[in-house]
Amino acid sequence: MKTLRCLVFALLPLVACQHQVATTAAAPESAKVQAAPSPPPALRLDEATRPTRYALKLKVIPTEDVFTGAIDIDLALQKPVSTLWLNGTELKIQEASLEFGGQSMAASPVDGGKELIGFSFPRAIGPGKAKLHVKYAGAVSTRDSRGLFRQQESDDWYLISQFESHYARLAFPCFDEPSFKVPWQVTLEVRKGDQAFSNTPVASERDGEDGFKVVTFRETKPLPSYLVAIGVGPFEVVDAGRTGRNATPVRIIVPRGKSGEARYAAEVSPVILDLLEKYFDIPYPYEKLDVLSIPLPTNFGAMENAGLVTASQIAFLAKPERESIQFRRGYAGLAAHEFGHMWFGDLVTMAWWDDTWLNEALASWITSKIIEQWKPDWYRGTTWINSKSRATSEDSLVTARKIRQPIDSEHDIVNAFDSITYQKGAAVLSMFEHWIGEEAFQRGIHRYLQQHAWGNATARDFLAAIGADTGRDIAPAFSTFLDQPGLPLVTVGLQCERGSKPKLSLSQERYLPAGSQGSADQVWQVPICARYENGKGQARDCVLLTQKTGELELASAQRCPAWVLPNEGELGYYRVLYSGDLLARLLKDGGKQLALAERIGVLDDVNALVGRGKMLYGEVLQLVPALSKDPHREIVTSTTRIVGGLKSHLIPESLRPSYAQFIRRVFGARARKLGWRSKPGEDEDTRLIRAAVVGLVADAGEDRVLQAEARRLTRRWLRDCSAVDADTIDTLLSVAAQSGDQALFVEIHSAAQKETDRRDRVRLIQTMGAFRDPAIEKAALALALSNEFDPRDSLRIMWRASAESRTRDMAYHFVKQNFDRLIERLPRDSGASLPAAGRGYCDGDHRRDVEAFFKDRSTTFTGGPRTLANVLEQIDLCVALKRVQERSVEAFFRQPERPVRAHFGSN
């Protein structure tokens, strides 16, 4: 999520603890809480006391806001303690006792502040074994998607858990850290009309009292608290068959009436799981795999609970006739990521949150590998390119995190789930895999999983396992990417001297955009592999650049190469600055010698040069006509982003007509040929490119014919959803709204109110944020404060409006004027994201306003300070880029048809 995933929840009645869970209607009063006799722990619990097993029993009713629980915790005490500290948040302790040395004694609750619950004893206990019994009550949220929460679908209510990163403590007292990894016994007391799911298959089910049933699940393998999970409600079960060495049963769990929408998930899930098992050469570690649908969107997207993956239904349920290409590819990627976690994160768990990358980066890396293996025609070797680009963009900021960031506060735990951990981590893994070889890397992965199965691991453990079979200690080089932020910029020059082999001169520094206040004085140990023309064909050579400067001899070159690609396969996590005419030579004849991923990578390098101020935007725009005719969808789509990204800040109003005319001249014929509607026999590339090209020409190109057609087709789609292809509808609705009037707004608003399909409802709500008429947009923004739609959905109106220069001010002032009301309605800590409403600004006045308004407010939300710092830095960089590039852009659009030589050169 960003993600953002982990559900942990365990239930269980302990035989030794004869506590009966009170009904939610008549919960016992809370026990008296004492003041702490000594200061409680700060961020981490004392490892001298460890759990060895949990037995948890929960009584949950999806229609109610409270639950009751009883938990028994087997303990191993290494030293005497008089107060035992556990994690617990917003729990009301009703009874507690401790068994030690054959005796039972009272355990008195002790106030530990927001995150902790203490239990004091009449005398010190330990060392030795003990058992803590606790009865308690807690809250079920309809606002948040953490701990235990409940959501409504039609007339039904569903209760689900989400415990990652540290939210199991909202559901039960526990040692809520990943290193405390032990078996769990879970029991749920639920209404007879509800289904109950957890990490393991059901062991037994019996009738309870007053219309309830008691469902006991098999004991789990060792799990940290964040990976325990439950789901309760009138779910339906879709059998997806069995797969793998152990014939693992796979099921799709959906809200009532949604079974028909699980077709694709049921078809694909077993295939993905089987491919993962074959790569790891380790059987799927758990007894079953359920994928459970959460009715509403959440802030975590999907969660890799062992044996019970959870995800928002919008991610994996669709009516068969509405399965778009993006939906199918999206679910396959989600499944590969979450199922990959069953090995990376579940079987082997990081010891502490500073190594979150061992879960998320590895799961992201294996996703690309599995999808490329399964469907090579989908991305043609480019699965990692877009995610890598996202990471490099984030990593160019001074406020960027390290992959392995020290954890000093709750903020750091939450901030760890970002593109640095996921995408940068995956890119660095791919780079070192390429350097040491795929087979050796795969053996290292197998060794890592085997050595640490059912336990915990650290970065040191992982790197030792990867390097064991290679004869290389990769830890020093790898750690330079783990333990410092930033992206290397490698400047490359070609040296050809008579009597010696050609060489590449190399130098490195941190890549920083124009205007950055950061220091470029950083050094990595960078694996650099270059491919080049050698007179007879192509050859490659590699070197580990460990110092500020270095060189790479092109050992197979028979003469000075006609071209050199300094980042073979685009697998290196670095940007390239080409000296002299190297870039021009590489792109001669359209760069036909380059693989698709490499061509995209070179374009990304060009964009980086523009961002750094080392290449003028006007020069890049000279490349656009040729790039727009490229046969590869990915190149054309990248080109539309280059052109479309100009409109917000670099095109003055006086030159908007020239800008629009340029877009129509370059892309117009293709857009008109494509049209808004798909045609029989079209391939997937054509269907996918339509939204990018037609959307650009209709919007930034101001094509009135395409705009009118978008409005007409929108009205038709509102009556018949088959009228427009599912891969195009979002762009079409946006274009229609941008030029739409009050009547169209009323139609879309009315349709959103009536829509029962979750995906279509969300897209209609978001579309209401795309209208440019101020009066219409004011009415749309007001919906974010009404009870007409779920606040998590209606806030999309504000985000859509903030992305458009003509409505950004309205959206930003709406957030400022209604900040407190929004915070009351939105999930807890959602306020951390609200500074991003000002992210699109590009001037000093708005920058100062954003900082003044959010500086103090952001500190009250977990992760808020970093979000604000990111937003402010992005505004600063936009101001600097505008200062460097606006003259070049303006000069180009004053004479867009005049040929200008593009200087690809040097620093």
Give each language-model segment a name.
Residues 388-389, 518-520, 533, 538-542, ...:
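Long, ordered, helix-rich scaffold segments
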Residues 20-33, 93, 113, 217, ...:
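Hydrophobic alpha-helical and helix-loop surface patches within well-folded domains
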Residues 74, 133-239, 261-264, 481, ...:
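Extended, low-hydrophobicity, Ser/Thr/Pro/Gly-biased non-transmembrane segments
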Residues 17-68, 154-158, 178, 475:
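N-terminal, polar/Ser/Thr-rich
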Residues 6-16:
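Bacterial N-terminal signal peptides
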Residues 94-99, 474-475, 485-567:
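Beta-strand-rich binding/interaction modules
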Residues 84, 90-153, 209-211, 549-559:
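A surface-exposed beta-strand-loop module
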Residues 72-92, 185-191, 460, 507-529:
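Surface-exposed beta-strand/loop patches in extracellular or lumenal glycoproteins
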